[in-house]
Amino acid sequence: MQLTDHQRSLLAQLADLAIPRDGYPSAADTGAVAFIEGVLEQDRPDWRSRVDRALNAVATARPPVLGAAPAGDRLERMLADPDIAWLVRLLAQGYYSSPVSWPMVGWRPDAGGAWEATETELAVTPRAALADRYDCVVIGSGAGGGTAAQVIAESGRSVLVVETGSYPSTAGLASDHLRNPRSVAGLPAPTDPDPMGRPRVSVVDGTARVVLPPDGGWGNNAFTVGGGTRVYGAQAWRFVPLDFGMAGAYGVPEGSGLADWPITYAELEPYYSLAEQRFGVSGGGVDPWHDARSVALPMPPLPRTEPARLLAAAADRLGWGTLDVPLLINSVEYQGRPGCARCGQCVGFACPVEAKSGMHNTALPAALATGLCTLVAETTASRLVTGGGGRVTGVELVAIDNGRVWRRTVDCAEVVVAAGATETPRLLLNSGIGNEHDQVGRYLQAHVYAGAIGLFDDEVSDLIGPGVSIATCDFRHGNDGIIGGGMLADEFVPTPAATYDYLTAAGLIPRTGLDSKQAMRHESRRMMRVVGPIQEVTSPDSRVRLDPSVTDRFGLPVARISGSIHPEDLRTQAFMSAKARDWLLEAGATRTAVSALTTRNQASVGQHQAGSCRMGTDPAHSVTDPDGRVWGHENVYVADASLHVTNGGVNPVLTVLANALRIADHLTKA
């Protein structure tokens, strides 16, 4: 989408004011104008009006933003306008995502050594070749769906796995710093659904607005074969016994939906061990809040990084316990996949050597190897078809095929829904299933994150991936006046664009000008972050509903996401962020900033989304029974994080894997 010559001139001047030329190229020197035009043409045509507003504000500002006044004065005026500030941030993201800028900040993706990239081939079946009937249809191919599909296929049943997303190559997911789930640039990633075909509605402070997959509030994870496990950080934490009984341990705060799980840690422990062995977890050390594992982890931890060594010594001085972060990443060769190459592009990216365990290189190949599993991609389950007695008899499928809408109903004996905590309730609601007591979609939660950032006098970053290496679990529970708590760990190796965003958001470096550029050169390798998720107390008013007026490209009502963060969650976030700062200061940080408090007035939804189809023992207060079976529908199961009554103060994927193993085990033996 081409700009006018006048707009190009304004944009080039703005880019060079924001990131000027010194001993290194300016933003305009590295193609800022072409970058913005490419974004408007290929990524976000809906941004054209905002770019026009920003450039018009530049042209008409009085006193002028562009002109002879001192640069500092002009920068201050420039950032006072929200549209100009937004455009400047986008320009900075483009600049620091370009390999041209990386030597300037001392960043490289291969600090841990070179590697030979590989691809995992999967047999994706054309839609025209689908059978009329399968014993089981599994909807979603992520952690829950992929795991369930393997167990069910290996039991001798025929399985169809339906995935809305495509199967992009590893190379296509391994290196783009702008277009990945961790980028803040707002550009669609290859793991996103079609931005224009899948809107959602986000309600904030009572005001509804239509949002697209790259936007905040949409609640994106990853729409691709393998789901979020293609590009996740792979932290493999267990929930601990207290996590399964939060209401009993702490009581129920006013306005919250805090409740106990219908199963205990002891019931899930064998499946935790099975998941750790089956999918491959590396790590070491003991979490003080759960007993020793019944089976030792199959791989030792990855060697600690330089930041981890500093944090370990600091924790010892503070009297805190630490452990190696458990990871679904091979530290050595395991099950035919190599050990980690220690690259600096891990979370948000596909693993170039397939050392990171994902459904695409574990469960799905195993399921397909039975000869009983069929995988179809770029196809959406639009409705579950019911017959007598609440039994589901089939699944309606829909897709775009050669530019036309394709529809097909596949018959089945059983259905497993594992489409994520936004799309799973949406499918049930669109199907009229499971909502007799208005429970489907309620208790939506994810993870509020706590943390702090520190700057050190000397360089502390060695850029050795994945980066996350050491954690303290001392504060998961047992904190006076706090409900639950969380885990704190060092952070994944950040990209230069992420580093810019972290430092500017914290107010530790200027956003623009020569001072900003020089600070990026000096501080990028002197920065360390300690972060972690907190245990949310949930709310019945945080929920997924069907929007009454907005539909997707197939005419189906989209998800309407509303709700808020409970005040207790903000108290816990502040408590844990203070602990993160203490840790950094003890490690030698000379300047620190804690994470800003999360905005309370919108629902918690994101990569760790959970809770929207919680399991329980009473149909009046849950969507499924303790075995994941939807109340009133004996052959419909849920097998993703939607089931979680609470979501722990740690990354939830290992619990999703373990619970999916448990549910599929029950299904195959029922």
Question: Predicted segments — roles?
Answer:
Residues 2-17, 24-127:
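Mature-region segments of soluble proteins
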Residues 133-161:
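N-terminal Rossmann-like FAD-binding beta1-loop-alpha1 element of flavoenzymes
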Residues 324-328, 339-346, 382-385, 525-536, ...:
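A glycine-rich dinucleotide-binding beta-alpha-beta segment and adjacent secondary-structure elements
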Residues 646-665:
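A conserved FAD-binding loop/helix module that cradles the flavin
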Residues 151-154, 158-183, 370, 379, ...:
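Glycine-rich loop(s) and the adjacent beta-strand/alpha-helix scaffold that form part
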Residues 166-191, 222-235:
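Conserved N-terminal glycine-rich FAD pyrophosphate-binding loop of Rossmann-like flavoproteins
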Residues 1, 204-228, 232-233, 237-238, ...:
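FAD cofactor-binding and catalytic pocket of flavoenzymes
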Residues 185, 192-201, 211-215, 235, ...:
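Conserved redox-cofactor binding core of oxidoreductases
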